[in-house]
């Protein structure tokens, strides 16, 4: 099973926007979280209070707001609790910007994937195009730089590589090659 924790932050962002909740209004954010149920229809189909949101959460308006939402301590604590519960209940690969450093600091295997900004931007542009959003490469690159800056400098659980993680540069690797490389490393240990 694969758990994309970034999707969880995107779902919360979508829900807050849908309810017109200002993220600076922490009382309203907390009220929203209290009535929030995140579940999965299938491994990669995330739901918020029973509504399937797999494609809506990948769109530009969510992407441009998710870093600000994920910087909120209340949101992080709420989602980390869910992530730890799921991670302890099932065998899974968990993907996220603070999994190895905060959520599961004692995980058996930790990989930190990197890639050249131009390659990451093109991958994201192609992903957005599949969702019907045709942004310029410069727009995508600017969005990624902004998100990286916000996520790396946030007060709670900033994006950072844990010292005991294995860094893999995926710039010149396909998804299958990345998986193959990770499996080889796991089998060696």
What are the roles of these predicted feature ranges?
Residues 1-58:
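N-terminal phosphate/diphosphate-binding loop that engages ATP/GTP or pyrophosphate donors
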Residues 2, 110-112, 165-168:
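Conserved beta-strand scaffold positions in the cores of enzyme catalytic domains, especially
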Residues 3, 7, 24, 28, ...:
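Charged, alpha-helix-enriched surfaces in structured cytosolic catalytic cores
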Residues 6, 50, 79, 93, ...:
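Residue-level signal for inorganic ion chemistry
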Residues 32, 43-44, 83-90, 97, ...:
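Small-molecule kinase domains that catalyze NTP-dependent phosphoryl transfer to phosphate-bearing small molecules
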Residues 54-66, 70-131:
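ATP-dependent NMP and nucleoside kinases share a basic, alpha-helical "lid"
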Residues 181-189:
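C-terminal alpha-helix
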């Amino acid at each position: 099973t694969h758990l994309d924790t970034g999707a969880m932050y995107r779902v919360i962002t979508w829900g807050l926007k849908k309810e017109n909740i200002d993220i600076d209004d922490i009382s309203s954010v907390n009220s929203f979280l209290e009535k929030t149920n995140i579940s999965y229809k299938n491994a990669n189909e995330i739901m918020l209070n029973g509504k399937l949101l797999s494609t809506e959460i990948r769109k530009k308006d969510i992407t441009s707001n998710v870093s600000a939402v994920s910087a909120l301590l209340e949101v992080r604590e709420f989602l980390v609790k869910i992530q730890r519960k799921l991670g302890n209940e099932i065998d899974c690969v968990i993907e996220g910007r603070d999994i190895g450093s905060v959520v599961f600091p004692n995980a058996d295997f930790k990989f930190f994937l990197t890639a050249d900004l131009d390659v990451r931007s093109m991958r994201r542009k192609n992903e957005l195009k599949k969702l019907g959003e045709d942004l310029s490469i410069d727009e995508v690159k600017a969005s990624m730089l902004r998100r990286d800056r916000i996520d790396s400098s946030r007060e709670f659980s900033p994006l950072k590589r844990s010292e005991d993680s294995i860094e893999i540069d995926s710039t010149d690797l396909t998804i299958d090659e990345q998986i193959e490389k990770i499996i080889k490393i796991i089998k060696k240990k």
